[in-house]
Each structure stands twice: as C-alpha cells, then as structure tokens.
Amino acid sequence: MARLHSLTDYDTKLLLAFLEGLKGDKNFLDFLIANNFAELAALANAINSDTEALEWLLKKSNYPEFGVLSNAIDGEENAIEWLKKYQCDFLLKFALACRKDDEAIKWFAKNDLKLFIMIIQRIHEILLFQSWDSSDVHRRRY
C-alpha cells in the first residue's frame, strides 16, 4: 500500500485555508485547488456532505484515507476500524475528537494543537447543523 497521508503533513497556511474552506469560503477552496491541494478542498467539501467530493477522495484521488476520515467523522464504524487497521493514529484521534470523544479532545489540548482544535470545533458546528437539518420536519420529503 502507498504511504498514507495525514493532516499533519500540511503547513499552517494550508490548514488555515482548509479551516476557512470548512466554513464554506469558496476563495480558500479555490486557493487550495490552484496550489495543488485539491485533496484538502475535497475533504472540506466531503465533511460538508458533498458526496461527489467524497467519491473523488475514495475512488479517484491518491488520498482515500481522507475519504475514510470523512466517513469516520460521520461515525461510520467501518471507517473507524479502517483507520485503526492501517494505523492512521492521528486521523483516528482527529475523527474521534470531531465526534466529541473526551479522551481524544484532551489529547489535542494536552499536545497544544490549537489549530487542530479550531478545525475540530468547526467540524462540531457542521455536525450539529447537519443533525439539526436532518431532523427538521419542514425539510423532509414525504
């Protein structure tokens, strides 16, 4: 298997652009794509429920582990098991922290990973909105 990637592979500038992309800022997503970091733009979009971006990560990119990360953030048990199996320890901790796992959140705080904590907080907001949006009876199709 090819070398697996991690969010720790990226410098601060790119992670800040990723954070802004998570917030939906198209300028930052375009910046990531223009600078050959389409995988970060796709991950931001996949976390925001873009199924085409998720499909691209999983099947067409060299970053399927980021597609698995998106699924793990959504709580898919097989994705969590995949991250464990392939020893993607940081991505696993990240996904668990995004799911509000106390031990994982404490690990990020203990290691003073402030930027990752900011990203995790943004993903918490996204997941909360997605949960609210899916339970809104006014949005359901019958």
Annotate the PLM regions.
Residues 1-142:
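Ankyrin repeat (ANK) tandem alpha-helical domains that serve as protein-protein interaction scaffolds
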